[in-house]
């Protein structure tokens, strides 16, 4: 067995079950393990949903139980400047961003990693993400988590080989029920704590109410694909492609009983376009992506077949990548796909290996 006793690992302790069990597993592997709790959002006293205090208390209870030191750090300024302002700008532009991906890029695997290495003397950081690291080729590769239902590689595609090489993912080889079973055996306070959802670090708020605090309402028309105005929306930012609930346009006498879907957002006209049923306008043959991040940091310069996900927990889509330049690619799907959404990430795979990804700039219904 490898002697890890001189290797210091700082675990990002979120107050959840995955990071709790990650810390324990690293202890079992003989590492010097300490925890770090990151506060990345300043909650005011009037906030109905205050999660950070409870999460910190849970993280501290786990560290006490495991005999670990817990450090705390406030990255709220970095989060606001590097994640949240971008998030708001994207919504203003009528796009649908994924803050979790940017949060991993700017906070967990940049600010946290640098702080752990430079200030705490860590060789590695560790997180409770459901991904795996593979060093068998001599270069660190990012693999999907063993639990296909929980795999989080989609959110970590911006990582470089160097960042993967400085990170450990102890629960990546386990399935979620096994992680909970370990936590229950250890009698950890987080054993039955439900998984966090909602915006990274901000928590489970009513999204529309939360967004309204920062972005003013921008009402505009709801139009059918034929150009008929049938309602009003309060802001394109509140709607996503493929959405069918909360449109407020049901029960029309001049329509069939089929559900209405959002099929487009025309930002220039501030218009939400809807159609009934599985309308062709919802489907795309491919996409253009930019702001590319390849894990090995080598641009793709020749056509390449692989698979892609255009949203989390989606089935892999066989596709062909055609490079336009080092910063932009065209992706052609083998079969048409619904609700490909600008602002979201397209993440590429070769089997178990996460190759990297980029931001969806546009979708197309014929090769462009």
Swiss-Prot record:
Enzyme class: transferase
Entry binding sites for ATP: 12-19, 38, 128
CDD domains per record: MnmA_TRMU-like (cd01998)
The reaction(s) this protein catalyses: S-sulfanyl-L-cysteinyl-[protein] + uridine(34) in tRNA + AH2 + ATP = 2-thiouridine(34) in tRNA + L-cysteinyl-[protein] + A + AMP + diphosphate + H(+)
Keyword tRNA processing: yes
Gene Ontology biological process terms in this record: tRNA wobble position uridine thiolation
Main location: cytoplasm
Xref: Pfam families: tRNA_Me_trans, tRNA_Me_trans_C, tRNA_Me_trans_M
Region (Interaction with tRNA): 150-152, 311-312
Site annotation Interaction with tRNA: residues: 129, 344
InterPro entries linked: MnmA-like, MnmA-like_C, MnmA-like_central, MnmA-like_central_sf, Rossmann-like_a/b/a_fold
Cysteines paired by S-S bonds: 103-200
Keyword field: ATP-binding, Cytoplasm, Disulfide bond, Nucleotide-binding, RNA-binding, Transferase, tRNA processing, tRNA-binding
One GO cellular component term: cytoplasm
Entry EC number(s): 2.8.1.13
Catalytic residues as annotated in Swiss-Prot or TrEMBL: 103, 200
Ranges for region Interaction with target base in tRNA: 98-100
Similarity section: Belongs to the MnmA/TRMU family.
Functional description taken from the UniProt entry: Catalyzes the 2-thiolation of uridine at the wobble position (U34) of tRNA, leading to the formation of s(2)U34.
Protein name, as recorded: tRNA-specific 2-thiouridylase MnmA
Gene source species: Aeromonas hydrophila subsp. hydrophila (strain ATCC 7966 / DSM 30187 / BCRC 13018 / CCUG 14551 / JCM 1027 / KCTC 2358 / NCIMB 9240 / NCTC 8049)
């Amino acid at each position: 067995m490898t002697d890890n006793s001189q290797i210091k690992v700082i675990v990002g302790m979120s107050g959840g079950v995955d990071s709790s069990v990650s810390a324990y597993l690293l202890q079992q592997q003989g590492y010097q393990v300490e925890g770090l709790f990151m506060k990345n959002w300043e909650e005011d006293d009037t906030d109905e949903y205050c999660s950070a205090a409870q999460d910190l208390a849970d993280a501290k209870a786990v560290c006490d139980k495991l005999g670990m030191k817990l450090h705390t750090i406030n990255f709220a300024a970095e989060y606001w400047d590097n994640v949240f302002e971008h998030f708001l700008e994207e919504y203003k532009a009528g796009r649908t961003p994924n803050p979790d991906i940017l949060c991993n890029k700017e906070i967990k695997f940049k600010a946290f990693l640098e702080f752990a290495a430079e200030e705490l003397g860590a060789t590695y950081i560790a997180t409770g993400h459901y991904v795996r690291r593979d060093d068998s080729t001599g270069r660190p590769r990012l693999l999907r988590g063993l639990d296909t239902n929980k795999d989080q590689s989609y959110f970590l595609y911006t990582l470089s080989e160097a960042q993967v090489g400085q990170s450990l993912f102890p629960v990546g080889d386990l399935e979620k029920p096994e992680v909970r079973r370990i936590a229950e055996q250890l009698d950890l306070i987080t054993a039955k704590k439900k998984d966090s959802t909602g915006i990274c670090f901000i928590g489970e708020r009513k999204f529309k109410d939360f967004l309204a605090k920062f972005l003013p309402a921008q009402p505009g028309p709801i139009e059918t694909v034929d150009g008929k105005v049938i309602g009003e929306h309060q802001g394109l930012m509140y709607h996503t492609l493929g959405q069918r609930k909360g449109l407020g346009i049901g029960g029309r006498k001049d329509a069939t009983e089929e559900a209405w879907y959002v099929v487009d957002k025309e930002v220039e006209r501030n218009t939400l376009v809807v159609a009934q049923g599985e309308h062709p306008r919802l489907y795309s043959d491919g996409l253009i992506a930019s702001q590319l991040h390849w894990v090995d940091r080598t641009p793709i310069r020749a056509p390449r077949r692989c698979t892609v996900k255009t949203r989390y927990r989606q089935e892999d889509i066989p596709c062909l990548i055609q490079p336009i330049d080092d910063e932009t690619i065209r992706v052609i799907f083998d079969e048409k796909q619904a609700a490909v959404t600008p602002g979201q990430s397209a993440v590429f795979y070769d089997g178990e290996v996460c190759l990297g990804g980029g931001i969806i700039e546009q979708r197309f219904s014929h090769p462009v």
